Amino acid sequence: VDSQFVTREKDRLLAELFEFLSIPSISTLPDHAADCRRAADWLMNQLTVLGCPRVELLEGNGHPVVWGESPEVAGAPTILIYGHYDVQPVDPIDEWVSPPFTPTIRDGKLYARGAIDDKGQVFTLLKAYEAVRDADGRPPVNVRFLFEGEEECGGDVVFDLLAAQPERLRADAVLVADMGYYAEGWPAVYTALRGMCYAELHVRTSERDLHSGHYGGVAPNAIETICRMLTDLKGRDGTINVPNLYESVIPPSDTERAGWESLPFDREKFLREELTAKSMTGIESASVFERTWALPTFEFHGIRGGFTGEGAKTVIPASAVAKISLRLVPGLSLEFVKQQLQLAVENVAPDYAQWELRFLHGGDPVLIDVDHPAFAVLDRAFEEVVGRRTVAVRAGGSIPIASVLGTGGAPVLLTGIGLPDDGLHSPNEKVTVQQMWDGIRVFGTFFEMFGGRD
């Protein structure tokens, strides 16, 4: 890698990244559909400037997919790069120190929505290719770029595209930089991702809201009902009361558990800096790694119903809605969990309540075999640039398309430059600027090594 690339181009790189991060490409909010298209157009322009002879905007029933192919180098291996240009909503907006779409650097950290998830990492991959593109007169690898705009909202455009055109997955390796270091100074490669089952639970207990004075004491309350149903579905100890769930889980191997036990872990720092909480919850007999990586979880994301405006209104709400999700681990398919969750809700719903589960999006968990030689190359690239090889860990999060990316037969390398306190999905999301510069060098070095230039 050109060792002076970042030093020489730093101002330009930051200006370009600020442009990208300034686009509020929130995929789940319809009002931002035009912004998602602007972000896609920005990426298309980047690929064109990089010299890609084939750049396409692939349309579907949702936000478009950006596709690009680098100039073909005969005999060189092909890497498929995946990332996403959409971002999470910014609520609660009043907790941001600086506006989420006004990128701001403070103390060597760049704050903006999408700084690490995933615009900053997409940018790092693009610039890594730029850094090695002209070395020795030609790029060391062929690169296919696949950037979607619905990773955060669970859309189907990229799934439909790859189902119809599976040849786009043909590559010698798939590189996904949407993850992070295990800890500062500890780069990681990921052996598993949890899947997702996201749904809304709708409950109705009467035809209309009722006067709490006239009917309090006899009328069923929809908010109370939905809360009781939810706490019946998830016990105080964190146990999920969904039939056949735990029995279907594929447990981690003894080797994997031993690897986790060797990792540095500061419980108090984890509580203070990552959870920002006084204590942990969950199944106490399971380790923190097991709870966050190897066991399913059930979370409640929001409840609406009744009166939540300023002042007082004394009603007994007739309806309520809860947004819920389960994170799935190997052994639990999305379709299986949908069926079991339906049965579980039937078991806890009172006779007086009408209810409906509406499934919004999801994906299967992913288990990855890291024995492929490509992982050893990535390991060497990290060691050369940051001085430490990767550790093998799992991720608690989900990348819906990950279960599809490897179906073409290529190994899927899940890695990234994030740090645990980067605040993904939270106010004041950030990326450490030096991590980004290191990432450009790491991925550029990986391209060169994978292409045989080491």
Segments the model singles out, each with a brief description of its role:
Residues 1-93, 319, 323, 336:
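N-terminal helical capping/dimerization or prosegment-like subdomains
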Residues 74, 183, 241-319, 331-340, ...:
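An extended, acidic, His-containing surface patch that forms the Zn2+-binding/catalytic region
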Residues 76-147, 438:
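Active-site metal-coordination/substrate-binding segment of hydrolases
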Residues 86, 233-237, 342-352:
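A common structural junction motif
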Residues 116, 207-209, 325-334, 363:
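A generic structural motif
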Residues 140-221:
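Histidine/acidic-residue-rich, glycine-tolerant segments that coordinate divalent metal ions
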Residues 216-238:
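A short core secondary-structure module
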